[in-house]
């Protein structure tokens, strides 16, 4: 039996973790033995229980000895190292335990802000190391491949494998809105790279003019103190939400304010629900929305507000949204992603 070892920082509710969760299920259904090693996470992480249904999960900070045991027992396994921390640990443990696993890098980052000098400097190290180790590399986005090639990453064996629709969504029985009244939707944890400052500024311009609308925020890390006083009555903070389809389905629009991204899953999720999207270009958002008729990328906050106001003043007909959703559901089928991973890892 083929064995695949995943090494990832945590199993929290992020884009990479969502893709991992779905891949673990698909590989398990195709008789691939797997072990997931969570470097910093714990059993309460958002995706831990779901992943544990299909394979063994090792929490490093609970029992590091199990990591050694796995590396020694599965010397011929392939290691899929997720993100930079996973990459570092994979090579560190392979050297420490003197084993021969084949390591594949899974790079999720596609852009960096000007102030991220340390991160950019680190890329030079990773680029040099990738050439020395001649590691195979999977990029989650075309933008990620482009950026890393600038830093001299090994090109011998690499591929861009986009996430598509990684999360299993229940697209039926969404007739009842989970939110009272009309709303604009933002989905994402509180993180400076995801543009919370942009979101608040846009909301301050838009919501006072539209008192019947609210801003609904779903994602971890948001607190009431982060919302300006004049917006508190028109803002709803939900935290992490498991059943997100009703939120997408009944939203007037999804707003996407990120500065940097890899492959933003929220855009795909919104598309398969037929939700209009207004956003800035980040990561692979242009390629994701290229064939989605209800997606609008803008260059300024002024244009952002104008697009949202148009959707508020002239809401799209349900039939238009349903047609766009059906097309997107076919276009973003995760089976294509799984097959690409399988063929790359087990050629």
Tell what function each PLM region has.
Residues 6-62, 221-223:
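N-terminal strand-loop element at the rim of the active site
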Residues 240, 259:
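Aromatic "clamp/platform" in nucleotide-sugar-dependent glycosyltransferases that forms part
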Residues 14-25, 182, 186-205, 217, ...:
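A conserved mid-protein helix/loop that constitutes part of the nucleotide-sugar donor-binding site
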Residues 81-87, 107:
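Short His-centered aromatic/hydrophobic patch
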Residues 291-303, 310-315:
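Conserved acidic donor-binding segment of nucleotide-sugar-dependent glycosyltransferases
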Residues 133-158, 165:
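A short, active-site helix/loop in glycosyltransferases that binds the activated sugar's phosphate group
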Residues 276-279:
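Short hydrophobic beta-strand element within catalytic cores of glycosyltransferases
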Residues 149, 157-181:
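Acidic anion/phosphate-binding donor-loop and adjacent secondary structure
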């Amino acid at each position: 039996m083929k064995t695949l070892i995943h090494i990832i920082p945590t199993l929290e509710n992020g884009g990479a973790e969502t893709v991992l969760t779905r891949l673990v299920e698909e590989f398990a259904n195709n008789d691939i033995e797997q072990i997931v090693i969570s470097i910093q996470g714990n059993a309460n992480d958002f995706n831990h229980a779901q992943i544990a249904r299909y394979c063994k999960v090792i929490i490093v900070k609970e029992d590091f000895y199990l990591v050694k045991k796995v590396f020694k027992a599965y010397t011929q396994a392939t290691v899929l190292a997720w993100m930079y921390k996973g990459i570092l640990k994979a090579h560190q443990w392979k050297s420490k335990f003197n084993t021969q696993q084949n390591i594949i890098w899974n790079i999720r980052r596609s852009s960096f802000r000007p102030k991220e000098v340390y991160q950019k400097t680190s890329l030079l190290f990773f680029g040099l190391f990738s050439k020395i180790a001649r590691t195979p590399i999977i990029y989650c986005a075309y933008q990620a491949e482009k950026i890393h090639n600038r830093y001299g990453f090994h090109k011998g064996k690499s591929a861009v494998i986009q996430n598509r629709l990684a999360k299993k969504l229940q697209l039926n029985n969404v007739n009842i809105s989970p939110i009272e009244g009309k709303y604009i939707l933002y989905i994402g944890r509180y993180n400076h790279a995801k543009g919370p400052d942009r979101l608040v500024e846009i909301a301050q311009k838009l919501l006072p003019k539209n008192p019947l609308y609210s801003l609904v925020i779903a994602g971890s890390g948001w607190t009431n103190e982060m919302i300006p006083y004049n917006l508190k009555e028109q803002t709803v903070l939900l935290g992490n939400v498991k059943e997100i389809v009703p939120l997408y389905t009944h939203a007037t629009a999804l707003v996407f304010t990120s500065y940097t991204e890899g492959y933003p899953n929220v855009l795909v999720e919104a598309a398969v629900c037929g939700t209009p999207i207004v956003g800035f270009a980040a990561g692979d958002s242009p390629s994701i929305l290229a064939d989605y008729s209800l997606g609008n990328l803008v260059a300024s906050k002024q244009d952002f507000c104008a697009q949202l106001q148009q959707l508020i003043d002239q809401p799209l007909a349900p039939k238009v949204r349903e047609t766009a959703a059906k097309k997107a559901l076919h276009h973003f089928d995760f089976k294509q992603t799984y097959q690409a991973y399988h063929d790359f890892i087990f050629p």
